[in-house]
Amino acid sequence: MGKRTNVDLGPLPDLIGYVLRRAQLVVFQDFFAAFAPFDLRPAQFSVLTVIERNPGLTQSQVAEALGIKRTNFVGMLDALEKRGLAERRQTAHDKRSYALYLTAEGTALTRKLKPVIRAHESRMVGRISEEGRAALVGLLHEIADGKPRNAAKLKGPKASRSPRAGSAET
């Protein structure tokens, strides 16, 4: 049997989730290559960035702002703290709550990372026009914000009709 070169992906190339995942793989592959010397993953970079821009936020505030589950966030913060990049300080108003700060080493690292993330972003933006980038980011924010739009504006048979009782559609 010969090697098949054309694979029918069916509806996949038209599905937002599929295309987003393919794009994410490209973005993350470049990110991991660029950030390998710093041994940082995207979520860790995000945490350091938010702490740098908002020193003194609590663990819960940073986790919520980034959409990271609390259990995952604690482990990630433990790793950043162990590396000497971030620190927890007990808040004055609530002894059970901890405010987050970068250490001197964390601050120095975030300075080093700025040109790295700019170069990474430039490589990704280089694939599309500036107008396309602005439109893409705007559309992705609409999806991420989770605000439903008017379903009647959608194209396709499912948006224009309602399922009948007993039909296979739900």
Model-derived regions: residue spans:
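Charged, amphipathic alpha-helical coiled-coil/dimerization segments
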Residues: 28, 56, 78-141, 145
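Membrane-interacting alpha-helical segments
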Residues: 13, 70, 100-102, 156-167
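Compositionally biased intrinsically disordered low-complexity regions
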Residues: 30-33, 78-81, 164-170
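N-terminal helix-turn-helix DNA-binding core of bacterial DNA-binding proteins
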Residues: 11, 18-21, 25-72, 83, ...
